[in-house]
Amino acid sequence: MVDFSSASSCFDIENLSLAYDDKPALSDLTLKVPRHRVTAFIGPSGCGKSTLLRALNRLHDLNDQVTRTGRIRLEGQDIHAREVDVAELRRRVGMVFQAPNPFPMSIYENVAYGLRLQGIRRKRELDEIIEWALLSAALWDEVKTNLHASAWTLSGGQQQRLVIARTLAVRPDVLLLDEPASALDPISTLKIEELIRGLKSQLTLVLVTHNMQQAARVSDYTAFLHGGELVEYAPTDTLFTNPRLRRTEDYITGRVG
């Protein structure tokens, strides 16, 4: 059992099982994700870590071949309850994918997109929120004189930070990151990692990564998944230096993949 000490839970996941077309992907997972911390999901390809991440904002609803049992609560509320507005859930629980996906429009309009959908139209208000979001994503100083250039003129690392700014602009409570730096060069990866560490004062972050060194650098808690099961979940320092289970030790030391 993980002791969060001063950190209360953001997500409470209870007995979660999920299958694609009757093929099990997650098996009876129970864990808590602490608020205002970085939690990493690690494990080999196909272990279920991205499946678990996407379950946290109901992206699996888009696939009618997925079946689910168990419960996920966000701040105490069952995210699958009938009264839950899925669009509002996905605003509260933002998602950043492996490959940067800026919209084919200007840097400014990328960040403004979600704000306009929320009914924000006044230019002064848009300007203020966009500046705040780009500052929060550590991108403002690089683009502030060129906001109306195409987002596609940015480097890959800048595009990923733009996507993070676009997500932050609508003020989520949680940011889900699925391998956010795997396609980036080392310098861009470092900037993303610094950004992740800095954002936890504002919101809760959940990170999927194949890179165990990255998990060790940026996360406060780490969950090791294998074969759709939660093998071990502990504070990151503990899991990497003194794992409780041999299976965990074998994976993090590279004896098994």
Swiss-Prot record:
Main location: membrane
Pfam families documented for this protein: ABC_tran
Cell compartments where the protein resides: Cell inner membrane
Gene3D superfamilies listed in its UniProt record: P-loop containing nucleotide triphosphate hydrolases
Membrane topology listed for this record: Peripheral membrane protein
Enzyme Commission numbers on file: 7.3.2.1
Domain ABC transporter: 11-252
GO cellular component: plasma membrane
Domain of life: Bacteria
CDD domains documented for this protein: ABC_PstB_phosphate_transporter
GO BP terms in the entry: phosphate ion transmembrane transport
One GO MF term attached to the UniProt entry: ATP binding
Catalytic activity: phosphate(out) + ATP + H2O = ADP + 2 phosphate(in) + H(+)
Family: Belongs to the ABC transporter superfamily. Phosphate importer (TC 3.A.1.7) family.
Protein name: Phosphate import ATP-binding protein PstB 2
